[in-house]
Amino acid sequence: MTAASGIGLATITADGTVLDTWFPAPELSASGPAGTARLTGDDVPADLAALTGKDEDRDVEVVAVRTTIADLNDKPADTHDVWLRLHLLSHRLTKPHEANLDGIFGLLSNVVWTNFGPCAVEGFETTRARLRKRGAVAVYGIDKFPRMVDYVTPSGVRIADADRVRLGAHLASGTTVMHEGFVNFNAGTLGTSMVEGRISAGVVVDDGSDIGGGASIMGTLSGGGKEVIKVGKRCLLGANSGLGISLGDDCVVEAGLYVTGGTKVTTADGQVTKAIELSGASNLLFRRNSLSGAVEVVKRDGTGITLNEALHAN
């Protein structure tokens, strides 16, 4: 059983909707009974107290809260609980799939994310008009998840485009996410990695792997699927390739080749099998025969790719 807790700032609308909760220093420990309690007076840390209060322009109130989770294996109890679990992932206190995230979409609100903070979707044009006296209003998106870097900035990583990494992503030290890379929540890297493609929800990429430009990895949200896809150590997904099975260590998927679970692949001995039967195997090269068009899989000798150390000295 793993417990977690955190003191944070919640943005709440006039009708009680929780837009966000920021936990600057979450912990893997319990500091009281499970649930969320609003803090007042001396219970509010001094560095957070000055940030609380009403924001009339956004029609919200920022309040201090303490959220405690007795067991991360249990489903989230409320919106604050979900936000704490997402922070734990991006703070690298938990790895993808170590905390139960069942039902989170029903607990999170759709939010207008702006340079002045989160705003309610309903009536936003009126809110925008009030905010304009502060300056230009930039809308980063309308979504249930914000950009990770607006809440957590993990050490030892590079993120070329902040819009491409959602809160709840787990980026290990040494990870570089280039402009076209994308990392969803409850997904990410476990070691030094180059990310120029898409790491979908639930996908885990191990140390030393390279997700090439435009490459796509199917996630647990794809078509309502439940398959959790893992990419092992020192693997390469070539540019514009795709992956719907897990890879062991030292594997390569040729550029432009999409390997789904049902893809028929021809082995070195001429046998034809579904790619799912090879899920999790190591030292494999998936390629397309340029003459016949057939997808082939052959054994690879030695270790896989080697990343450029200079690109990951973050």
Curated annotation (Swiss-Prot):
EC number(s) from the headed UniProt entry: 2.3.1.117
Keyword Amino-acid biosynthesis: yes
Keyword Amino-acid biosynthesis: yes
Subcellular localization(s) per the UniProt record: Cytoplasm
Positions of Mg(2+) 2 binding: 180
Residues reported to bind succinyl-CoA: 198, 213, 216, 239, 254-255, 262, 274, 287-290
Protein's GO biological process: diaminopimelate biosynthetic process; lysine biosynthetic process via diaminopimelate
GO-annotated molecular function: 2,3,4,5-tetrahydropyridine-2,6-dicarboxylate N-succinyltransferase activity; magnesium ion binding
Binding site for Mg(2+) 1: 163
Keywords: Acyltransferase, Amino-acid biosynthesis, Cytoplasm, Diaminopimelate biosynthesis, Lysine biosynthesis, Magnesium, Metal-binding, Transferase
SUPFAM superfamilies: Trimeric LpxA-like enzymes (SSF51161)
Catalytic activity: (S)-2,3,4,5-tetrahydrodipicolinate + succinyl-CoA + H2O = (S)-2-succinylamino-6-oxoheptanedioate + CoA
Chief localisation class: cytoplasm
Record: active site: 196 (acyl-anhydride intermediate)
Taxonomic superkingdom: Bacteria
Alphabetical list of InterPro entries matching this protein: DapD_actinobacteria (IPR019875), Hexapep (IPR001451), THDPS_M (IPR032784), THDPS_M_sf (IPR038361), Trimer_LpxA-like_sf (IPR011004), Type2_DapD (IPR026586)
Pathway the protein contributes to: Amino-acid biosynthesis; L-lysine biosynthesis via DAP pathway; LL-2,6-diaminopimelate from (S)-tetrahydrodipicolinate (succinylase route): step 1/3
One cellular-component annotation, GO: cytoplasm
Summary of the function given for this chain in its UniProt record: Catalyzes the conversion of the cyclic tetrahydrodipicolinate (THDP) into the acyclic N-succinyl-L-2-amino-6-oxopimelate using succinyl-CoA.
Quaternary structure and interacting proteins, as annotated: Homotrimer.
Record-stated family: Belongs to the type 2 tetrahydrodipicolinate N-succinyltransferase family.
UniProt protein name: 2,3,4,5-tetrahydropyridine-2,6-dicarboxylate N-succinyltransferase
Species of provenance: Mycolicibacterium smegmatis (strain ATCC 700084 / mc(2)155) (Mycobacterium smegmatis)
Lineage: Bacteria, Bacillati, Actinomycetota, Actinomycetes, Mycobacteriales
Gene: dapD
